[in-house]
C-alpha cells in the first residue's frame, strides 16, 4: 500500500480559518490527514467527517480518537451533506473542506477494481450497497459511441475512439488487467513509452461515470455554501480540469453579479452584491518543495470561498 501524504495540508487548514469552538466538516475523510489537523485545532468545537468506505471509517475513527473525542464520522456520500448534518441537529457550520484526490483505502484493494496496478474485477463503485452500475456493465454493455463519449468527456482521452472500438471487439472483458491490455493495444507506441500509465485516463473516466462524481460534487458544493455561517468558508482541493470546471462555475455563480460576467475586462473592480466572496481570484498551487516531496500534488489546486 502506498503511503498517502495529504496535499496542500498547511494551506487548506490555514484558509479554513479554524475557530477553536467552531463546527467544521471534512467531506472527504479518506486517510484522515486533513481531519486530524482540523481536530487538533478544536477546543470546544466539533468536526464531522464524511466517507462511504468502511475501511476509511474504521481507520479514521482509530486515528482521530487518539487526538480528541470532538468528532463524529458520518457514513455516506457527501451529496447528502445537508441531510446528514440535519440528522445531527446541525444546520449551519463555520467551514467545510473537500479534498477531491483519490485517497481512500479502497483504491489499494484489488477486488474493488479501481486500480490499473492491481488485477481485480471491473467494479469501481464507491458505494457498493446502493449503486448497481459497475465498470463491468459499462465496458461490456455500452455502445461504442457511448464509450467514446465517456472516455472523451471524463478522461480527456485523445484515443477514445480507438479504445472504444477495441473494447467492443475484445468483449467480454472481466478484469482490470484485461482492460489494461485492450487499452495498450489501442494506443500508439510513442504514447506507451511515456511515463504516465496508458490506462490512467480510461480508468479515471470509468470511475467518474460509475460514481456520477461531477454531478455529485456540484450538488454537494451548492448545499455547502448554503450551510455556511457568516465568515464561514468552503475550501476545495481539485486535481483535474473537470473538478476545476465544476468548482469555478459554482463559485462564480455565488460571487459574481450578472454585470460582472460581462464586464470582467474592466480595469477596476465592480463590487458584487452577492453574499459570497473569493479569497483569491486564481487558485493556489503547491510549492515546488511539496511537488518534489509528493508527486501526487503536482496537479492540485486550492480554491476558497467565504460567506460575507
From Swiss-Prot:
Keywords per UniProt: Cytoplasm, Methyltransferase, rRNA processing, S-adenosyl-L-methionine, Transferase
Gene: rsmH
Residues binding S-adenosyl-L-methionine, per UniProt: 32-34, 51, 78, 99, 106
One Pfam family this sequence matches: Methyltransf_5
SUPFAM superfamilies referenced in this protein's UniProt entry, alphabetically: Putative methyltransferase TM0872, insert domain, S-adenosyl-L-methionine-dependent methyltransferases
MF GO annotations: rRNA (cytosine-N4-)-methyltransferase activity
Family: Belongs to the methyltransferase superfamily. RsmH family.
Taxonomy of the source species: Bacteria, Bacillati, Mycoplasmatota, Mollicutes, Entomoplasmatales
Known function: Specifically methylates the N4 position of cytidine in position 1402 (C1402) of 16S rRNA.
Catalytic activity: cytidine(1402) in 16S rRNA + S-adenosyl-L-methionine = N(4)-methylcytidine(1402) in 16S rRNA + S-adenosyl-L-homocysteine + H(+)
Species: Mesoplasma florum (strain ATCC 33453 / NBRC 100688 / NCTC 11704 / L1)
Domain of life, source organism: Bacteria
Xref: InterPro entries: RsmH, SAM-dep_MeTrfase_MraW_recog, SAM-dependent_MTases_sf
Broad enzyme group: transferase
Protein name, as recorded: Ribosomal RNA small subunit methyltransferase H
A Gene Ontology term for the protein's cellular component: cytoplasm
Location in or out of the cell: Cytoplasm
EC id: 2.1.1.199
GO process annotations (BP): rRNA base methylation
